[in-house]
Design a protein with these regions (language model features):
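Terminal alpha-helical segments
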Residues: 1-118
């Protein structure tokens, strides 16, 4: 079971990837991957919080959603996390057109989650 430090390291690694030229919004067309990376940044932030609050590690996305809804410190971000989850599913599995605006919105959502959790 990963610990808080493991999730923190993965969050930082994912966040660093977003800062590379490959995923710079001014030049990339890989908006689907930007959203995917943003989503997994959020996942690891939430897992850090769950480990810190409950010594708990989610087993899957559904379990994490239930934990978010039942954890007082995470409940305020439940709606934006769920919206980011849906957007990541759209980017990963639906093969829909993902735009720069979609990626920018995902990045703003991550900032909100960072403020709530960090």
């Amino acid at each position: 079971m990963p610990k808080k430090v493991d999730h923190d390291n993965q969050y930082k690694s994912n966040k660093a990837l977003l800062k590379t030229s490959t995923f710079d919004l001014t030049s990339t067309k890989h908006y689907d991957w930007v959203i995917t990376i943003v989503f997994y940044c959020a996942v690891h932030l939430i897992e850090m919080e769950l480990d810190g609050c409950k010594n708990y590690d989610s087993i899957d996305h559904y379990d994490r959603k239930l934990q978010i809804l039942s954890t007082k410190s995470l409940r305020p971000i439940s709606k934006i996390y769920l919206a980011l989850y849906i957007e990541s599913m759209r980017a990963r599995y639906k093969c829909e057109n993902i735009t720069r605006d979609d990626a920018e919105k995902a990045l703003r959502t991550l900032v909100s989650i960072e403020k709530a959790v960090c």
